């Protein structure tokens, strides 16, 4: 069979003739005498589209033959109208060439080789050996975009075994008896690859590195190329426009406006923290003044409504750290209630975990802790006051 995708990678439609049909699991696997449907390979996704108006669900290669998986069997065998999902194909070509271009630039500029890549449906990644800094990454990105506008020719061919011995690729050739195809960005990169690529770098349009991270002994670089990069630009431009409206600033002033906003927010957070601490200290004094004393121990109990549980927990810790005290707090929020039981570490007679376990059944809850601190929550906040009174009486009986 003839693989048209290697002869003309820009072919969007063609006429086909069926030479074999296999029915497997209710689907029809069609072999044509020629096809422009790329079955996938080299990390690149395979083509989809239509054959005789029937949706192509998958394309795969088996023993050198390219099969097309269809929902139903075509009614005729010859002169079938075959159409590729061109947007999908061209996107795959752009992302794949983008990987070759970035890999070539990193190797050409810094001698850094590629140790892996992934061509995804939304974003793609390339792994470059070593840990690269931002300056290095941006330099490679700029060089890649410069070469796009240089309109370098991209060649794809399958040398004979004799010719392969003279080919010097960026990475070692795979050891196989099968045909090895070469993709060459003229003047930059030469590598083994069975994928389908644009004829020149200009068809790549633009390439944008979005972010990067350390990955094992390499730097994993996330990028978008071609139409994806253009779409990414428009999306970010729209977002920037909305941010400018919210900040009431021009694009050039956006960064400073955000910095000022963050600084003002930090100041407000600091001020709010100080106010909360002052209110907390006042609240602690108020609770201590009205609390019951059993010998040298102050027994503090309180029910809060709509308060932040973490904040109330901090108040409990502060009281038991600064005073010889036992704290029994309940915090109602909606239908739920949280119990926070604490005691000073020099009070050995009372185990807060045991007190909580006995009490929490009254609010249909669960919880746990240790001798000096225990917490839990339940869904029956109608029994909150009963639960606190029950725990208070248990502690009285232990201490008196």
Predicted regions and their residues:
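Hydrophobic helix-and-loop "lid/oligomerization" segment in the mid-to-C-terminal part
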Residues: 238-335
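Divalent metal-coordination and catalytic microenvironments
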Residues: 42, 100-102, 126, 195, ...
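A generic structural motif
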Residues: 29-30, 63-72, 124-128, 372-379
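A conserved active-site cap/scaffold subdomain adjacent to cofactor or substrate pockets
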Residues: 198, 210-257
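Functional cores that coordinate and move charged inorganic groups
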Residues: 88, 108-215, 400
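Active/ligand-binding-proximal structured segments within catalytic/core domains
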Residues: 35-51, 75-126, 372
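Glycine-rich, acidic loop segments that terminate in or are immediately followed by a histidine
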Residues: 193-204, 301-400
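Conserved nucleotide-binding/hydrolysis modules and their immediate coupling elements
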Residues: 1-78
